[in-house]
Design a protein with these regions (language model features):
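Short loop or secondary-structure boundary microenvironments that flank
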Residues: 33, 81, 136-138
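Short Gly/Pro-enriched loop/turn and capping motifs at secondary-structure junctions
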Residues: 59, 81-84, 114-119
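Short glycine-rich phosphate-binding loop at a beta-alpha junction
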Residues: 24-35, 111
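Active-site-facing substrate-recognition patch
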Residues: 1-23, 72
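Short histidine-centered catalytic/ligand-binding loop motif
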Residues: 3, 76-79
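Short, glycine/charge-rich flexible loops or terminal/linker lids adjacent to PRPP-binding catalytic cores
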Residues: 37-76, 83-92
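Conserved acidic residues
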Residues: 27, 73-75, 107-109
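PRPP-dependent phosphoribosyltransferase catalytic core
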Residues: 92-138
């Protein structure tokens, strides 16, 4: 994760190159927590797209919004890693609940992780623990 802080321009170029190489059509990055809040505005501006940050439940805020930012039509989940899938599930649920509430539609088009190297995970190929059950999966 240090790449965000040491070389954010390098991270941006790696994300751009990876998504271009994979022919991913996207218009939004969505992440969660402080690291997303720090990098997504810069990343999205550089790649000419929208961004949104989903608040973690434990984060106190003056805002009643679970999501800050804008979600377009084709969004990419952006996080340092996917281990159990808890954050991935939570972000997906928040995005779709928010869109449903606003009577909008958007498609999830994959995930980008950046902890060791920038990696694109196409839909259904995310390294999510199959044993992990999120509260809305039942």
């Amino acid at each position: 994760m240090k790449e965000i802080f040491v070389d954010p321009d390098g991270l941006i170029e790696n994300v751009r190159s990876t998504l271009s190489h994979e022919n991913v059509e996207y218009d939004t990055f969505v992440g969660s927590g402080l690291s997303a809040a720090l990098i997504l505005p810069r990343l999205a501006t550089a790649l000419d797209c929208a961004w949104a940050v989903v608040r973690k439940k434990s984060e106190g805020s003056h805002s009643c919004n679970e999501i800050e930012g804008t979600i377009g039509e084709r969004w990419v989940f952006f996080d340092d890693l996917i281990e159990t899938g808890e954050t991935w599930h939570r972000v997906q649920k928040a995005v779709y609940d928010n869109l449903r509430h606003q009577r909008l539609r958007a498609s999830y088009v994959g995930a980008v992780t950046y902890s060791w190297e920038v990696t694109y995970w196409s839909v259904g190929r995310e390294p999510v623990d199959p044993e992990f059950k999120f509260e809305y999966d039942e």
